[in-house]
Structures are given as C-alpha cells and as structure tokens.
Amino acid sequence: MSLLKDFSYHTVCFALMKIVRTGNLSKQIKSLTELEIVSRNSPINKIGDNKKATFEINDNLLRFYFTFIYKNASALQVLGAEAFYDEYVAPTLTDFISRRFEGICRDYFSLQVRSGKLKGVRNIGSYYYDDPVHRKNGEFDVALELADGYAIYEAKYYAQPMTLDEIRREAQQVANIKELAVKQLGFIAINGFVEQEKPYTYLDGNDIFAGM
C-alpha cells in the first residue's frame, strides 16, 4: 500500500470509523480508494455489476483492527489481551487468515503471468456463481479468465492436508455450475494433500510461496 505510509494509522482509522458510524460511504470511499487504503473488488464475470462489488481494507493491520477490535474495544479493556484473544479472536482467526490466503493465491498467479511463466490469461480474480438447482450462490476463490473459458482453483487454508473426499466434493460443486466453462480445475491447500487424482492441478503452500 504505497500511499498509506504518508498517513498515520490514527488518521486512517479515524476516516474508516467515520464511515462506519455515519454510513456516509459514498463521500469517503473515493478518497480512501485513491489512497489505496481500500480497494473495490468485483468477480471477473461480474465486472459491471455494482451489486456484486465489494470494498475491502488493503492493510492487514487495519483489517485485523476492524475485524476484531473496533466493535469490541470495551471488552478488550475489561478482559485483557489474553482472555480477549481467546474469546473474540481465536474462534474466527482461521477464517480471517484463509481470506487473506485466497488473495495470496491470486497474487501468485498474477506474478506467474507477469514473469511470463503463465500464458493466455486475460484476467484474475474470483468467479460469482448462481446454482438455481441447489438454490445457492457464492464465489469460487481463484479464477483465471482464458480465451475460451476459465481455470478455477479452490484455495483451502486447512490445518491438515486436504483429503480426496474434500477434493471430490469441491469438484462436484464446480461441475454443478452449468454456465461455467471450466478448462482447468485445481486445488491449492496450504498443508498439501492426503491423496491426489487426475485430472486436477495441485499446489501447496510451498509452491505458492516459492513462486512469490
């Protein structure tokens, strides 16, 4: 976040808290985006759909503060750091980190394209899907737009290696989306895999961080 270094964290936090308190998003979000404090993200298949767009804080420290501390500051004062961590942070910390891991995986593919190691990629992001048969919608974590379809990767920040049953469930979920032209399906598991089967692509944490 190149421009954030010119501003104190107190200044940035004040600006973000003003948005949270007043709900006056439209007047503030442009400035925060220009300063690279927040970024606007859209699924690569819904670029022009404002309803599918989200804004997220780029800086990890600020993200942590507004996720865990901002709404619970009084509890932190009463409980102390250790008890506060056990009650408010620990139960959802893995989910917090896993969302950052998804971003790291997208950055990995971006670097692969920039370095010339990966060809034919037109865009990188997430993919929004709507599954009317099973009455559910959501996003696939990592999507690479190709000329004739998509490469889809499911990123998993698991404490244990990903199992074959989990792989098959994820693969079936992708297969259920009839509108999606999948040219390559892959899995990224921070701690690797218990077992692998064709025709999928597999990457673990070592692969991702070695390529960064």
Q: Where are the regions that the model predicts?
A:
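Short conserved micro-motifs at the rims of enzyme active sites and ligand-binding pockets
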Residues: T67-I69, E154, E197-K198
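Conserved catalytic cores of phosphodiester-cleaving nucleases, focusing on short active-site segments
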Residues: F109, F140-P161, E170, L185
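Extended hydrophobic-aromatic, low-complexity segments
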Residues: S74-L76, K117-G120, V133-K136, F140, ...
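Domain-level recognition of nuclease-like catalytic cores that cleave nucleotide substrates
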Residues: G186-M212
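Conserved nucleotide-binding/hydrolysis micro-motifs of P-loop NTPases
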Residues: N45, Y158-A159, G192-V194
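Accessory nucleic acid-recognition modules appended to NTPase machines
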Residues: M1-N137
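Long, low-complexity, charge-rich intrinsically disordered regions
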Residues: G149, A155-K156, Q173-I177, I190-G192
